[in-house]
Amino acid sequence: MESSRRPLGLTKPSVDQIIKIEAEGISQSRLQLLNPTPGVWFPITPGFLALPSSKRERSFSLQKDKECLLPMESPLQSKRDIGIDTTAVLLKHLMGSRSNYCPDGIFTILAQGPMLEPVMETALKVSSGLQTAKRTPIPALILSKGTQAVMRLFLLGLRPARYCLRAFMLKALEGLHLLADLVRGHNPVGQIIALEAVPTSASLPLL
C-alpha cells in the first residue's frame, strides 16, 4: 500500500507530456503543413529549422521563442548584381561618415594617432599665441627610445646590435628615397624643393 502511493508535491512531467501540451496549442492544419510525412509528430517552433524525424524530440515552449529578424539589404547590395556602378555612392558615403576627402583623392582619417596630437596642439598654441611651455619634439622621443633599445642589445652582445642598426639604416634609406619621389610627384612643375643629398648604401660604413 505504501509503495503504491505517489509522493506529494510537484512532479516533473515527462517528455511525452511536454510534447503533447505544446502540440495542443498548434492547429491541426498547421501541423499538416509543417509535417507532410504521415505518422510523424514533431511540432516545429518558429525561428528554428527542424527536419522531420521519427523520434520524438524535446522542444522549447512556443511562448519563449523570439522573432528572428532578417538583416535588411542595403541599396548598394541590391544594385550590386544588376550591373549598376555604385562606386560614386560608396565614395560619398565614406566622405560623409568617417573621413575627410581631399581633391587629389587622398582620404584622411579623422582620428589621428596618439603621437601626432601633441604636435598639433603645440602648432595651434603657437599660431594663437598661447604657447607657455616648450614640448619635446617627436623625433627626439623616437630617437631616445631607439637609443635605449640599442643599448639593451649591446648588453646582450655586439652581433644583434649591429644587425638591428643595419636594418634600421636600410629602412631609413628606403623611406628617404620614397619621400623624395613623393615630394617630386605632388609638387607642380616649376617648384623645386632642395633636398639634402641622400647617402647611398655604398657610402655607409659596414657595421
Swiss-Prot record:
The gene encoding this protein is included within the N gene (alternative ORF). The keyword Kinase does not apply. GO terms for cellular component: virion component. It is found in: Virion. This is Protein I. Keywords: Virion. Belongs to the coronavirus I protein family. It comes from Murine coronavirus (strain A59). Structural protein that is not essential for the viral replication either in tissue culture or in its natural host. Confers a small growth advantage.
